[in-house]
A protein has these predicted regions:
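Polytopic transmembrane helical bundles with strong interfacial aromatic enrichment
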Residues: 1-180
């Protein structure tokens, strides 16, 4: 009965594929906990979480695209003002995605249980044993002290970045409204 527009069919097909892939990742993740140790790999957990965020973001993008079709004239009048803001917000969204993945590593390794004090990790801000694994770079993915420290530092960075971006955006939009 042609209830779904033809241009929407490829987008819905991608959603269907991503959902199936999520199921496959979920099975693969749980399979890692069905052996001797009843826990899942932090890598598989993080991949499963990351794909879930991608699916959610894609669904929002498609939904907002449907709304945008009816609001196109409003968007073109504001496009000159908001181009830089839009690009910056995409970059921040990407950083938020990596923050979520970092949280997946914290959850998968149970690193959050190692230091339950905040803002200090134990008695210091920078804990002892940071990046002590060999090879050095593997600490970011497998050492619980380093994983939790990185997650916290990423949170501080994003807080400052988003706060600064919010102030910049408000000022930019206020000045453009005053000029018009």
């Amino acid at each position: 009965t042609n209830r779904i527009k033809k241009k929407l069919t490829p987008k819905l097909s991608i959603m269907f594929f991503l959902g199936g892939f999520q199921g496959l990742l979920g099975w693969y993740m749980v399979k890692s906990g069905l052996v001797n140790i009843p826990s899942v790999s932090q890598y598989r957990l993080t991949a499963h979480l990351g794909n879930a965020v991608i699916i959610y973001g894609y669904m929002l993008w498609v939904a907002f695209g449907l709304l945008e079709d009816s609001k196109q004239s409003l968007m073109t009048s504001a496009s000159n003002i908001t181009k830089g803001i839009r690009v910056s917000s995409y970059a921040i969204t990407g950083l938020l995605f990596f923050m979520i993945l970092s949280g997946g590593l914290v959850a998968g390794t149970r690193a959050g249980l190692a230091y339950s004090t905040f803002p200090l990790m134990g008695e210091t801000f920078i804990p002892v044993g940071l990046y002590s694994s060999s090879p050095f770079w593997l600490s970011a993915f497998e050492d619980i002290t380093t994983i939790q420290f990185n997650h916290r530092m990423f949170a501080y960075f994003l807080f400052v970045l988003i706060f600064s971006f919010s102030i910049y955006t408000i000022r930019k939009l206020d000045s453009s409204i005053i000029r018009s």
